[in-house]
């Protein structure tokens, strides 16, 4: 038997057969079927969507942001690859109603054509592929908290931008350093309603422990925790293989922010029929850009890195890893410090 009795996970009554069906179903209904008005039912009026680029509060603001994205990418498709989820304790729940609450981590791959002007500049006609990872807290068929990481590095590279150059251009188009939209930082957070951390499943705890050890400088854990042939899907829509690539990625991030505080926020592990054991971890780095690494010359800029990682496990350890952070939001924070 799987670790989830799917008959228990019926958010919003019996329309949805389980939590993955709800998350994938409303995503298609909103974005592809153009039922943007349904956001008023599926998203709470005071809920917050936090992304590395900003924080958006309230379903009306989410509708506006959704319209802007669809106007720029009218043929956008959102293909759900996985939804990792767990029930939440009554004491952790916010949102409406008195039903069972859920935390979910949705991994999807998007396809789109940059065919209209918008946030990404004049239309390039380029075909895009990129991932999103999103953690949502829901109850009674309504999402009341969300943390979303979009692979902006992949989007801007495929359009023809370097992430740093795009961040500089965006600051200018938004009115300069004083007037531009400020990237998300914990000090800007508000309307936090979900207070839990996920579940205690061993797979999730192992994944979180590996991340903690790497961020503490114990890069040697990669040899024991990762499959030698690990498949990696990384920011910039980069695909890599092997332990050396995992070491290069995680060391390049940590060495850029060697003194930053690393924190685990959500951890879930899950085992289901037809799936490998898998996990989802939402994490962050907060501190100074004080080292040489993936983000160039140290600047001393205060930076918050919002990250989400999914992992799948096999007989030889972590065999597939999907990790996202937003390179453009990191560069924007650095450039706001350095000019």
Predicted regions and their residues:
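C-terminal and inter-domain tail/linker signature
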Residues: 1-339
């Amino acid at each position: 038997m799987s670790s989830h009795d799917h008959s228990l996970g019926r958010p919003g009554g019996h329309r949805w057969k389980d939590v993955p069906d709800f998350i994938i179903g409303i995503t298609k209904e909103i974005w592809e079927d153009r039922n943007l008005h349904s956001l008023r039912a599926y998203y709470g009026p005071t809920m917050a969507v936090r992304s590395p680029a900003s924080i958006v509060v309230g379903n009306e603001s989410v509708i506006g942001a959704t319209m802007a994205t669809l106007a720029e990418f009218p043929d956008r498709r959102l293909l759900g690859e996985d939804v990792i989820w767990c029930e939440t304790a009554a004491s952790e729940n916010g949102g409406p109603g008195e039903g069972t609450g859920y935390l979910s981590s949705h991994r999807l791959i998007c396809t789109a054509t940059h065919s209209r002007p918008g946030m990404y500049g004049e239309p390039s006609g380029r075909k895009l592929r990129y991932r999103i990872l999103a953690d949502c807290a829901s109850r009674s068929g309504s999402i009341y908290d969300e943390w979303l990481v979009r692979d902006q590095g992949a989007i801007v590279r495929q359009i023809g931008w370097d992430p740093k150059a795009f961040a500089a251009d965006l600051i200018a188009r938004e009115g300069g350093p004083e007037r531009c939209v400020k990237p998300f930082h914990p000090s800007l957070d508000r309307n936090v309603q979900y207070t839990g951390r996920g579940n205690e499943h061993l797979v999730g705890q192992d994944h979180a422990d590996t991340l903690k050890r790497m961020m503490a400088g114990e890069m040697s854990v990669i040899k024991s925790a990762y499959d030698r042939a690990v498949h990696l899907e990384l920011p910039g829509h980069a695909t890599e293989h092997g332990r050396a690539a995992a070491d290069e990625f995680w060391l390049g991030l940590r060495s850029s922010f060697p003194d930053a505080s690393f924190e685990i926020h959500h951890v879930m592990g899950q085992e289901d029929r037809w799936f490998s054991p898998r996990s989802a971890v939402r994490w962050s780095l907060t501190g100074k850009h004080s080292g040489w690494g993936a983000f160039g010359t140290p600047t001393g800029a205060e930076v918050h890195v919002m990250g989400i990682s999914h992992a799948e496990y096999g007989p030889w350890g972590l065999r597939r890893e999907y990790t996202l952070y937003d390179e453009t939001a990191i560069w924007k924070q650095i450039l706001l410090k350095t000019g």
